[in-house]
């Protein structure tokens, strides 16, 4: 099968030359107890998005072959660039990227799958003002379909990144649009550090999906 060159990992350019260090405040907020944090935050999200009661949330640990990791070669290159940048960050960052590269280059890679049922999903599309955009691309903002929701896509959305030893998540969501048509979005995101590659500066975020405007696959 021919690979789509427009699907893969891409980092936004850092034209302002801002520094995005390893100690991301959102991740650090949950780093002390990531397991209880992800259980609490995802349970809240599932509860808020309940469409048919009762809603279900299932956690499952799986392992995939390294070749099955989405666009793995591109992701390894990003990790190596971040590892080089981490030399100015200190031992904590260097240890993280060394461990991340060992994992991504191992025979298998562990994934914690969180799957819910009887919910509205994370409603898109990936435009400003939608729950999907708030979850994947916004900082310091929240947006949920139900304004009475107990949680938000604010600080809590960082819990999965804190649990991930790669600071990486993949999202697959189904939702109904304004015409009641079923839609599906798939995208990956990493929160790493700002870095340089081929003479260009990049931010600390990396996105997997449609490389045009960092969009999810739909």
Question: Could you tell me what each predicted segment is?
Answer:
Residues 53-74, 133, 169-212:
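Flexible phosphate/Mg2+-sensing switch loops adjacent to catalytic phosphate-binding sites
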